[in-house]
Amino acid sequence: MATRIDCDERRPTVQTRVWIDEHDWLHGIFKSPHNTSPKFRFPDLLSACVSLAFRDSANQARLITYVLTQLSLRDPKTERRSCDIWAPQFELLLDAHRGPWNSFPNSKFDIDAIATACVAVSRLSGDAVASVLRQVRANFRARCSTGNSPLN
C-alpha cells in the first residue's frame, strides 16, 4: 500500500539525466580553477543552467527553439549520465515538460532532453562558465535565505 510522502522527508535534490556532451561540459566547469571556495557540485551546476534557461521569456524561447531544432536532430540513443538537480529547478523542468509546446499534438520530449537543452543553451551564451558560476552563487544564496542552508 502506498503511503503519503511527508514533505519534511523530501530530498532536497532529484535525480535526472543529462546527455553525455553536456554532462562533460558540466564536468569541465566542476574541475575548472574558477570553481573554488566553495567548490560547487553537479546539482549546483545543472540547477544554474536550468535557472538561466528559464530566467526570462527570451531565454525560454531560445530553449524551446533549441529542443525543437537542434536536440531533435541528435541520436535519441545518445549516452546519458545521472545528475542530481535541486528541487526548485526540477520543478521548472516539470513545468516545461507539461508545457503546451511539449503536449499533444506536438512531439513529446523527456525531462532529460529538456535538462540537456538547458545546459546546451547556457553553453552557447557569451562567457558561459562565468555566467553559470554567477547563477550558482545566486541560487546558493537564495537557498540559504529561505532556510534551506547546508546547516539545516
Task: Please identify what each model-predicted range represents.
Residues 1-31, 65-97, 140-152:
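Short Lys/Arg-rich basic patches
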Residues 37-65, 106-139:
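Short, basic amphipathic alpha-helical segments that act as recognition/interaction helices
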Residues 14-54:
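Short, highly charged
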Residues 31-34, 100-104:
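Short, recurring structural edge motifs at helix starts
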